[in-house]
Amino acid sequence: MVTIVLNKYKLLDKIHIGQQKLEDLLFNLKSEVKPIDENNIEIEINADRLDLLSSDGIARAIKGLLEKELGEAKYNVTDTEYTLIVDNVRTRPYALAAIVYNAKIDLEELIQFQEKLHGTIGRKRKKVAIGIHDLRKVDSKTIEYKEVPLSYKFVPLYGNKELTISEILEKTEQGKLYGNISIANGVSPAIVQDDGEVLSIPPIINSNKTRLDENTKDFFIDVTGTSFEAVAQTLDIIVSNLAEAGGTIGRVKVLKSANSSQLSSPLFLHKIQNVREEYVKKILGIKTSKEEICKHVMRMRMNCDIENGVIRVTVPQYRVDILNEIDVVEDIAMSIGYNNLEPSKYISTNYGSYDYMTLLERKIRELGIGAGYVEISNFVLIKDEKLFSNKYVKILNPVTEEYNAVRDSLIPGLLDFLSKNQHAKFPIRVFETGDVVVYDSSTDTGFRNDKRAAYAIMDNKVSYEDIQAPIHYILKSLGLEVNYKEENNNIFIEGRSASIFYENEKMGVIGEVNPDVLIRFGIEYPAVIAELYISEIGKRLTNQR
């Protein structure tokens, strides 16, 4: 959910209804209203409904439910003489721009709208950043988006003197927060007039030159980012909501210098979504018709036509939450009102049961305890230096370097546990079951989840045979007659380790820990370890059932 704060009276004045009616209609849109004080209300909105993050967007939606306006909102659009030249900006390659004339907006609300978009579709400015400028203060009709050196100077927003970009990164709050997103190789993305004056360095900060004030009615809007689709959608949402406030949208010519391509911005990205009448009836459990379905779609501010018996919904640019047929059905439910949908009776009763892998893991844990081992539990995250493989999932922004990777084996965690418990009474026999993430080139992500069990013994004197016997007992108790094939790796002593096979399928590894590995973990006593691949064991046992 996304929370916005609006002036209650300004919002009610746009739709001419009472507060209780407003709350009821917003509830239909899956939003909740909470009073803050006499003048202001707090509204919780679903994070996918970006079009509702301002009072004008809410007013547009409610006018549809009240049937004051039906179908897609129509706005005045005109061509302008403004041009945006997009150069090769390596860290944020995409940029679009638009003009909005004569929009009557609340400045505080516009800034809130901008920041809520930054936090949602913008992913805290990493994916998309928005610059909103006072058009009166833009001196050039040709604007360029390009890389500039960090020595470039301009007066940052609310500043009173020129600073270099390097100084902005060091001295301003925005520079400290967002500088690491886009700065690379000593250059920064920048929106620049044709005379070289900087208007903004996205996603960090605007220039004070084009600062908005209460008298601003004409806007130059730039949107930059790492995803062209997200940039286009964000610009469409902003200009649509400003146009809802009485503004006229001005197109900007966008030229891509790298390939000389040209387009007109904003793009107003529409899509056609076909909806089946029977599908709507099935999902909502109602009796309806194509005409009734179209009526509800129009109430949700989308266009709807029936062509050759097919319901065709035209999704406007501001409804980026509509991805497929089920999203349209959800909108129909909102138009009808969830309270007006009759709950259906249960036509069958089903009983849940444990997943087979859960039962298998439970059985393996019981066998481990029965074999004299104590169960421990480590974190799934681990320090990458403790891993033995170089193919693992790295955490991009870890809270601490102690947990900067996802484990691909349970063995490092057991060794770490042994290193911290060398003072305990010997022998130490411990085991763990849990999830790991292993490299797998056949999957979409290159990795897959795997379930494993690992066993360790540490004593003054311990050998391969000490771990092999209980492992063989556990596997035999599961109904598996396994073979052990000598295989060497960097964890175990050469000639004192093996892989565990069942019918030519590898089920685990076992061996005496290499002294170099013991030294690496600070362990002063010999240790033996085995790791079983529960996921593979489960597949084989399932085939035998």
From Swiss-Prot:
Name of the top EC class for this enzyme: ligase
What are the disulfide bonds? none
In its UniProt record, which GO terms are filed under biological process?
A: phenylalanyl-tRNA aminoacylation
Q: InterPro entries per the record?
A: aa-tRNA-synth_II/BPL/LPL (IPR045864), B3/B4_tRNA-bd (IPR005146), DNA-bd_dom_put_sf (IPR009061), Phe-tRNA-ligase_IIc_bsu (IPR045060), Phe-tRNA-synth_IIc_bsu_arc_euk (IPR004531), Phe-tRNA_synthase-like_B3/B4 (IPR020825), Phe_tRNA_ligase_beta2_arc (IPR022918), PheRS_beta_core (IPR041616)
Q: What is its EC number?
A: 6.1.1.20
A Pfam family that this protein carries is tRNA_synthFbeta
Q: Does the keyword Nucleotide-binding apply?
A: yes
Q: Which reaction does it catalyse?
A: tRNA(Phe) + L-phenylalanine + ATP = L-phenylalanyl-tRNA(Phe) + AMP + diphosphate + H(+)
UniProt keywords (A-Z) are:
Aminoacyl-tRNA synthetase, ATP-binding, Cytoplasm, Ligase, Magnesium, Metal-binding, Nucleotide-binding, Protein biosynthesis
Predominant location = cytoplasm
Q: Where is the B5 domain?
A: 268-343
Q: Which cofactor does it need?
A: Mg(2+)
Q: Which GO terms describe its cellular component?
A: phenylalanine-tRNA ligase complex
Q: Does the keyword Calcium apply?
A: no
Compartmental location:
Cytoplasm
Q: What NCBIfam families does the database record attribute to this sequence?
A: pheT_arch (TIGR00471)
The entry assigns this protein to a family as follows:
Belongs to the phenylalanyl-tRNA synthetase beta subunit family. Type 2 subfamily.
Subunit-structure text: Tetramer of two alpha and two beta subunits.
Q: What is this protein called?
A: Phenylalanine--tRNA ligase beta subunit
Upper taxonomic classification of the species? Archaea, Thermoproteota, Thermoprotei, Sulfolobales, Sulfolobaceae
The gene from which this protein is expressed is: pheT
